[in-house]
Amino acid sequence: MKLAIGRLLSPLFLKNPQKPLIITKRFYSTPGERRIKDILTEKLSPSSLRVIDVSGGCGSMYQVAIKSKAFQGKNTLAQHRLVNSILKEEIRNMHGLNLSTEVEDDISAGGSTTSS
């Protein structure tokens, strides 16, 4: 059956019909992503929040991009420290956290977006 599907799709979608078609985009959240989203939403009421488990689903590395009014008046380091303190318990079980923060109303400077 896999060969039949491969042959059927090969003219349109596959460069090499001998290799299987692999879909890599996830359309679901991991439990860790949901937990981090819930915590940050409750504490910071962000206007924009994206949490991605970049460890392949094992929950050891996350990428977080957050935009919130709670960051007003804080420099980038203070913004990151705030997020780190909120996620203190979760961070203990992580290998790493890639964090990007932005002030919600800072239109002129384009926000305070950085990665660490």
Curated annotation (Swiss-Prot):
<dbReference type="InterPro" id="IPR052275">
    <property type="entry name" value="Mt_Fe-S_assembly_factor"/>
</dbReference>
<keyword id="KW-0496">Mitochondrion</keyword>
<dbReference type="InterPro" id="IPR036065">
    <property type="entry name" value="BolA-like_sf"/>
</dbReference>
<comment type="similarity">
    <text>Belongs to the BolA/IbaG family.</text>
</comment>
<dbReference type="GO" id="GO:0005759">
    <property type="term" value="C:mitochondrial matrix"/>
</dbReference>
<dbReference type="Pfam" id="PF01722">
    <property type="entry name" value="BolA"/>
</dbReference>
<dbReference type="InterPro" id="IPR002634">
    <property type="entry name" value="BolA"/>
</dbReference>
<protein>
    <recommendedName>
        <fullName>Uncharacterized bolA-like protein C4B3.11c</fullName>
    </recommendedName>
</protein>
<dbReference type="GO" id="GO:0005739">
    <property type="term" value="C:mitochondrion"/>
</dbReference>
